[in-house]
Amino acid sequence: SGPIQLWQFLLELLTDKTCQHIISWTGDGWEFKLSDPDEVARRWGKRKNKPKMNYEKLSRGLRYYYDKNIIHKTAGKRYVYRFVCDLQSLLGYSPEELHEMVGVPPRDDD
């Protein structure tokens, strides 16, 4: 309860099949990529009634999570982040189960 937090909002988009063109799982655990960071920021601003929201401000919100061990940035990849908190117990799904639900193709790492 309470106002929605950025990480919850991102998770909401990530579990919505219709949002896969702007944000999606990479198929590697809880890693995800903002394919259209400006659109993600616009929607976040709309949700929070902050019309001036942009990716720069949104990424500041994401950086705030680094120390809290909620989300980390994936080094060397632009707009790629990873949930490092225990999402599995929070959601009751493994990343693989969640990927399957939203239609993320499994990775071939063999």
Curated annotation (Swiss-Prot):
Principal location: nucleus
GO BP term, pick one: cell differentiation
Gene Ontology, cellular component aspect: nucleus
A Pfam family: Ets
InterPro entries: Ets_dom, ETS_fam, WH-like_DNA-bd_sf, WH_DNA-bd_sf
PANTHER family referenced in this protein's UniProt entry, alphabetically: ETS, ETS-LIKE PROTEIN POINTED
Name under which the protein is recorded: Protein C-ets-2
Organism: Lytechinus variegatus (Green sea urchin)
